[in-house]
């Protein structure tokens, strides 16, 4: 059997009307990931509903409700092969109220493709586009390509393409720390397929790569094997004849039998006896591996979901308090000092109190708008100081980004998301 191609996760971001789903549908179709018969059927369905031209987007919008509304809601995962990779597409929604998905979606991505409508050069960059690019950057995405879409609506005009390219570079990408000179801007017409997988004859003035070729040129993610071991516990089983078997996904570092380990904040110390994945014993496990492991010296009652495993020589950080950069996504009123919602960080769910509102930021650029604001409302970005009400493992995103991100939930919805930029460790 040939060695499997490495997987590359690519987030598709941008304003809802830029044609993201159509671009993704076209990549899947021309990449051979969709049965052409399905497209014929969907085309008929789209025409009957008076939405001719939406058939590729239908591929991504599996949900019936989404079909009728013409809006992508959940993060949809689809795969297609390129020469080098098995590409998994994370199709991030475009509307404001779906930024939460954007945050969870983008944080799984190795690279992003920003899809924009060439016509936006006349009306200006959409606020949602700014927010998506800023969030992607905040979430650690460093590889970006830009698909300037709907080129067919401007007769494949090179002047319009150049105007859009310059505007994005000057008014957005440079501001958030991307260098436009290192970014490919591909003129595409996703509905027709121009420059998506196949080189277009309509853009003789463009000598660059197609979108699929640009995706193929992204660098594969490096597994964070050199970072300290961090493994958030999902469940703990007690197996007769074996003992305590915690399970979870290795986020960073390497785990192997014989390792001396500690679970925080539980404080339980033990030694790894065996590591298993899919019922097979492994000599070691690395980031991305979902494993079960047996620990000598630790009982089922000593540890629980939300604890994080690390080596005794470099234990996980239990936060006394932490400073974070957050984006408020939705909130019926305002957030003030003393507000104590539930934080979802790795596998833990712990209430944390807002101790200080230090700075209010422009969500599109990160610049400081106000020092020590009285409150935060939906749409605000901010730097805040937080204190967990119970022991919680949190790492600074500068040191171990995989354990520095969180979502904040209250009243049955995600009200904010963010990342820890500084953590004060609890004294033992």
UniProtKB/Swiss-Prot annotation:
Keyword annotations from UniProtKB, A to Z: Cytoplasm, Elongation factor, GTP-binding, Hydrolase, Magnesium, Metal-binding, Nucleotide-binding, Protein biosynthesis
Domain tr-type G positions: 5-225
Residue segments, region G2: 70-74
Keyword Ribonucleoprotein part of the UniProt annotation: no
PANTHER family from the UniProt entry: TRANSLATION FACTOR (PTHR23115)
NCBIfam families: EF-1_alpha, PRK12317.1, small_GTP
Protein's UniProt name: Elongation factor 1-alpha
